[in-house]
């Protein structure tokens, strides 16, 4: 159930170039039960920036009432968020959206988790949930260069993990699809989050597979009221039917929405 709460900053640190790990504490964590959901963060105390920032939930610890989120500090809002210190309060709205369907993967099956850039973040909680129910996980993490690689070791603790960098400075040179081809990776179910170009490439290959993708869209309200994040349905070529990424998603079955 969505709530609004001022949460305490437990810790914040830069874990890769311009990539920050922020841990917040509050009872709101008890509502975080679906990997792939997100929160809407008020990044500053004053009026500006006006809009909240949507950030994926990376890890949940309900025993400690803590959750972790990862984000890239690149605009005014996220750069402001990166200055928050331990003990300060952050205004959080969430959890929002529909997450990854863990129940679609069965014990003994193999799940392929493919993340690109900051889209790697929500796959960490998902991977933990899948492993807990006896699903074998394989991770492919795609980045531009080695300076922005994060959480490789954490994913490796859960299952086979491959990294691709566009410039070849770490792992396989190229894209996540190059890793799949090079190692001949097979799987029963696919979960993915990342840039549209990556999601389109996966959709072109695996439209007939059981697969789910999480969209990274700019949002205004985060609750489905402003229509800033609509996407059209593939089954309706007229373009009149749509879904809202913030409330109907951000996770959709592959092939459902136009990428």
Curated annotation (Swiss-Prot):
<protein>
    <recommendedName>
        <fullName>Dihydroorotate dehydrogenase B (NAD(+)), electron transfer subunit</fullName>
    </recommendedName>
</protein>
<dbReference type="GO" id="GO:0046872">
    <property type="term" value="F:metal ion binding"/>
</dbReference>
<keyword id="KW-0285">Flavoprotein</keyword>
<keyword id="KW-0479">Metal-binding</keyword>
<dbReference type="InterPro" id="IPR019480">
    <property type="entry name" value="Dihydroorotate_DH_Fe-S-bd"/>
</dbReference>
<keyword id="KW-0408">Iron</keyword>
<keyword id="KW-0411">Iron-sulfur</keyword>
<dbReference type="Pfam" id="PF00175">
    <property type="entry name" value="NAD_binding_1"/>
</dbReference>
<dbReference type="InterPro" id="IPR017927">
    <property type="entry name" value="FAD-bd_FR_type"/>
</dbReference>
<dbReference type="GO" id="GO:0009055">
    <property type="term" value="F:electron transfer activity"/>
</dbReference>
<dbReference type="InterPro" id="IPR017938">
    <property type="entry name" value="Riboflavin_synthase-like_b-brl"/>
</dbReference>
<comment type="subunit">
    <text>Heterotetramer of 2 PyrK and 2 PyrD type B subunits.</text>
</comment>
<feature type="binding site">
    <location>
        <position position="229"/>
    </location>
    <ligand>
        <name>[2Fe-2S] cluster</name>
    </ligand>
</feature>
<feature type="binding site">
    <location>
        <position position="226"/>
    </location>
    <ligand>
        <name>[2Fe-2S] cluster</name>
    </ligand>
</feature>
<dbReference type="GO" id="GO:0016491">
    <property type="term" value="F:oxidoreductase activity"/>
</dbReference>
<keyword id="KW-0665">Pyrimidine biosynthesis</keyword>
<feature type="binding site">
    <location>
        <begin position="70"/>
        <end position="72"/>
    </location>
    <ligand>
        <name>FAD</name>
    </ligand>
</feature>
<keyword id="KW-0813">Transport</keyword>
<dbReference type="InterPro" id="IPR039261">
    <property type="entry name" value="FNR_nucleotide-bd"/>
</dbReference>
<dbReference type="Pfam" id="PF10418">
    <property type="entry name" value="DHODB_Fe-S_bind"/>
</dbReference>
<dbReference type="GO" id="GO:0051537">
    <property type="term" value="F:2 iron, 2 sulfur cluster binding"/>
</dbReference>
<feature type="binding site">
    <location>
        <position position="221"/>
    </location>
    <ligand>
        <name>[2Fe-2S] cluster</name>
    </ligand>
</feature>
<feature type="binding site">
    <location>
        <position position="246"/>
    </location>
    <ligand>
        <name>[2Fe-2S] cluster</name>
    </ligand>
</feature>
<feature type="domain" description="FAD-binding FR-type">
    <location>
        <begin position="2"/>
        <end position="102"/>
    </location>
</feature>
<dbReference type="InterPro" id="IPR012165">
    <property type="entry name" value="Cyt_c3_hydrogenase_gsu"/>
</dbReference>
<dbReference type="InterPro" id="IPR023455">
    <property type="entry name" value="Dihydroorotate_DHASE_ETsu"/>
</dbReference>
<feature type="binding site">
    <location>
        <begin position="53"/>
        <end position="56"/>
    </location>
    <ligand>
        <name>FAD</name>
    </ligand>
</feature>
<dbReference type="GO" id="GO:0044205">
    <property type="term" value="P:'de novo' UMP biosynthetic process"/>
</dbReference>
<dbReference type="InterPro" id="IPR037117">
    <property type="entry name" value="Dihydroorotate_DH_ele_sf"/>
</dbReference>
<comment type="pathway">
    <text>Pyrimidine metabolism; UMP biosynthesis via de novo pathway; orotate from (S)-dihydroorotate (NAD(+) route): step 1/1.</text>
</comment>
<dbReference type="GO" id="GO:0050660">
    <property type="term" value="F:flavin adenine dinucleotide binding"/>
</dbReference>
<dbReference type="InterPro" id="IPR001433">
    <property type="entry name" value="OxRdtase_FAD/NAD-bd"/>
</dbReference>
<feature type="binding site">
    <location>
        <begin position="77"/>
        <end position="78"/>
    </location>
    <ligand>
        <name>FAD</name>
    </ligand>
</feature>
<keyword id="KW-0001">2Fe-2S</keyword>
<comment type="function">
    <text>Responsible for channeling the electrons from the oxidation of dihydroorotate from the FMN redox center in the PyrD type B subunit to the ultimate electron acceptor NAD(+).</text>
</comment>
<comment type="similarity">
    <text>Belongs to the PyrK family.</text>
</comment>
<keyword id="KW-0249">Electron transport</keyword>
<keyword id="KW-0274">FAD</keyword>
<dbReference type="InterPro" id="IPR050353">
    <property type="entry name" value="PyrK_electron_transfer"/>
</dbReference>
């Amino acid at each position: 159930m969505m709530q609004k709460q001022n949460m305490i900053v437990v810790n914040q640190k830069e874990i890769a170039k311009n990539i920050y790990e922020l841990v917040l504490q509050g009872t709101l964590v008890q509502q975080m039960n679906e990997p792939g959901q997100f929160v809407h963060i008020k990044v500053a105390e004053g009026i500006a920036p006006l809009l909240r920032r949507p950030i994926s939930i990376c890890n949940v610890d309900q025993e400690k009432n803590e959750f972790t989120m990862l984000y890239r500090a690149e605009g005014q809002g996220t750069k402001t968020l990166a200055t928050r210190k331990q003990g300060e309060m952050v205004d959080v709205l969430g959890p929002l959206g529909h997450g990854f369907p863990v129940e679609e993967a069965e014990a003994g099956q193999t799940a392929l988790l493919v993340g690109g850039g900051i889209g790697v973040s929500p796959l960490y909680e998902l991977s933990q949930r899948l492993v807990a129910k006896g699903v074998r996980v394989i991770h492919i993490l795609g980045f531009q260069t080695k300076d922005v690689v994060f959480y490789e070791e954490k994913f490796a603790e859960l299952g086979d993990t491959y990294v691709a960098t566009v410039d070849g400075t770490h792992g396989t040179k190229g894209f996540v699809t190059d890793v799949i081809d090079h190692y001949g990776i097979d799987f029963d179910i696919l979960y993915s989050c990342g840039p549209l170009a990556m999601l389109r490439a996966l959709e072109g290959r695996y439209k007939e597979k059981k697969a789910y993708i999480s969209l990274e869209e700019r949002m205004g309200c985060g609750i489905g009221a402003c229509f800033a994040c609509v996407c059209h349905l593939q089954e309706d070529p007229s373009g009149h039917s749509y879904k809202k990424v913030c409330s109907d998603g951000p996770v959709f079955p592959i092939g459902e929405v136009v990428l």
